[in-house]
Each structure stands twice: as C-alpha cells, then as structure tokens.
Curated annotation (Swiss-Prot):
Domain of life of the organism encoding this protein: Bacteria
Name of the gene encoding the protein in the UniProt record: rpsP
Alphabetic keyword roster: Ribonucleoprotein, Ribosomal protein
Family: Belongs to the bacterial ribosomal protein bS16 family.
Organism for this UniProt entry: Polaromonas sp. (strain JS666 / ATCC BAA-500)
Pfam families: Ribosomal_S16 (PF00886)
GO terms under cellular component: cytoplasm; small ribosomal subunit
Protein name per UniProt: Small ribosomal subunit protein bS16
Disulfide bridge positions per record: none
Length: 83
C-alpha cells in the first residue's frame, strides 16, 4: 500500500519534515517515491512553515494513496490558510 506521510529531517531539537509518498513497508526516513512538500513546525517570522504541491497530492490521492492522520491535518491546515 502507498501512503503519504512525514519523513523527519533537521537536527536534534530542530525538527523539519518532508511530506513524502512511500510504500507502507519502508521505514519512516527510508526510500520514498516522491517528495510532495515540507512542514517546518518551528518556522518563525517570514519563514514558510508548510508547502504542499496540491496537484501531486490530488494525483496520489486519486490513485489510492492513504494519507497519515498528521498529513490529513496539515492538508486541512494548508487549505484553511490558502482560503
């Protein structure tokens, strides 16, 4: 099964997450199919905290990829911010 989930990056105490499409059996930070965005939970000032390629998200959801609960929350948050 293909899932859309967060892959952690950054350094200790400075998390940064890539929003990736990956096979469910692959480890969290392992091989992925496509990177469709990022989430920076500690963005300050003018820094961008969330970016998701909506066209790619729509494509992957259309072919059956399952978003994680956190990614679902971030998508809703991004849609509310864009509206």
């Amino acid at each position: 099964m293909v899932v859309i989930r967060l892959a952690r990056g950054g350094s200790k105490h400075r998390p940064f997450f890539n929003i990736v499409v990956a096979d469910k059996r692959v480890r969290r930070d392992g091989r992925f199919i496509e990177r469709i965005g990022f989430y920076n939970p500690i963005a300050k000032g003018g820094e961008e905290g969330l970016r998701i390629a909506q066209d790619r998200l729509t494509h992957w959801l259309g072919v059956g990829a399952q978003p994680s609960p956190t990614v679902e929350r971030l998508v809703k948050q991004g849609a509310a911010k864009a509206a």
